[in-house]
Amino acid sequence: GGGFILLAGEVGTGKTTVNRCLLEQLPDTTDLAIILNPALSALELLATACDELDIDYPKKTESLKALTDALHQFLLANFEKGRKTVLMIDEAQHLDFDVLEQIRLLTNLETNEEKLLQIILIGQPELTEKLARAELRQLNQRITARYNLQPLNQDETTAYIRHRLEVAGLAGGVSLFDRGAVRQINALTRGIPRLINVLCDRALLGAYGQKRNQVNRSLVRHAANEVFGDARQSDSRGR
């Protein structure tokens, strides 16, 4: 344990879903601090982490050292009880450089055996670019696992749509989207799962309205025009 885990991906590629699955798999012996608003100073971030973990500290302190010491004592006590501590920061691409440096310093909190704090940074691709800058070299070197969520290709889009429909209760082997429709969906959404969900939902509604048993390219184009407007359609035809 310890160090940093990086999860990066464009908006809509499934970071929140992966995050949720990860949280569900954390053992009961884990204490978790989640920071969803990264527009914080270093002091505010440490205070928020302490609040999340129910750590006592002088509430009006302006001292980073006081907050770090309080966190360190908590981490040591947790370690002695056999518990793990995880700090998860979402939208981490918005963190200022001085805040990222303060977060790096938290990974210095360790025993002779191991790091006391596991930090998970979640953000858009700009986060990866930011961490590659020279001034964050030391933090970048402490990342022990990197995951980059990519858009789905056509085969993955087919499998994804099938899976979503089966989870919703559709019998296996039944296809509500013909191949041309799936190709169109992949092109129009650029393989972004969140957009695939929106477009499929609208196309299925259109098929229901026309009493059709299967979605074709025409229905997808019509649905895309309703949810995305004309710009994405013309962009898709030019691809």
Segments from the language model and where they lie:
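Short conserved motifs of the RecA-like P-loop NTPase core
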Residues: 63-72, 84, 160, 173-188
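Short regulatory helix/loop adjacent to the ATP-binding pocket of P-loop NTPases
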Residues: 23-25, 127-142, 151
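C-terminal alpha-helical "lid" subdomain
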Residues: 167-239
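Walker A/P-loop nucleotide-binding motif
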Residues: 1-21
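Conserved NTP-binding/hydrolysis module of P-loop NTPases
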Residues: 29-31, 40-59
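Conserved AAA+ ATPase "SRH/arginine-finger" region at the nucleotide-binding site
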Residues: 35-39, 131, 144-157
